[in-house]
Amino acid sequence: VMVGFVFYKKNSTHSDYVLGGRGMNVWVTSLSAQASDMSGWLLMGLPGTAYLLGSGATNAIWTAIGLALGTYFNWLIVAKPLRKYTQIAGNSITIPDFLQNRFHSKSNVLRIFSALFILIFFTVYTSSMFAAGANLFDYVFGIGYIPALILSVVVVTAYTFLGGFKAVCWTDLFQGLLMFAAIIVVPCFMYKGLTSNTFEWSEIGKITLGVSEGFGAMGIVSAIAWGLGYFGQPHILTRFM
């Protein structure tokens, strides 16, 4: 919330509020893009899938491979052209604006439909992220799911409305560094715990990346296909703009 107040006074134009005036540091922008993408699903959803499902570990590994490829090609193919053409196409500061200006639409149909699609599907996506945060707070602090959900919604909404794009990117930066540290530290603790437990090591040894019963070639293709989502996620594409 304090970050929101800090950047509230630094936003002087509509472009500053919505897109940070296109002047965000490259490290802040890139880490923000990855942190906003690798949100609750990376630290809670994907490990949970790997733990609960029979072929979950194999599924999670192939999904991670697909997402890594999707992230790489999204930055390689989309990032620079999108930044360039959003400026050329009427200095567009939102995805709906860019689509309308890029294709020289005389009506607002393209803008309205793209905005509606983003609103509908991102409401579902955002709700799942709030649910993940609420579950985490409830588990760590024991305050109950509903109070944790309300707290998450209030805090995120407050700094977003106050500071706009800059506040979101800087909070994403801190969260991204925290997530990166967790990804490094947690496996180290897991390894330390597993060294004295042969049962878990034997179970890990059963994980295979090949075609197996319950997880065939179609499952592998479906898992890798998750990476295709990167090319159309507006919260990531906005960072490129």
What do these predicted regions represent?
Residues G20-G21, L31-Q34, S114-I120, T171:
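Hydrophobic alpha-helical segments of secondary membrane carriers
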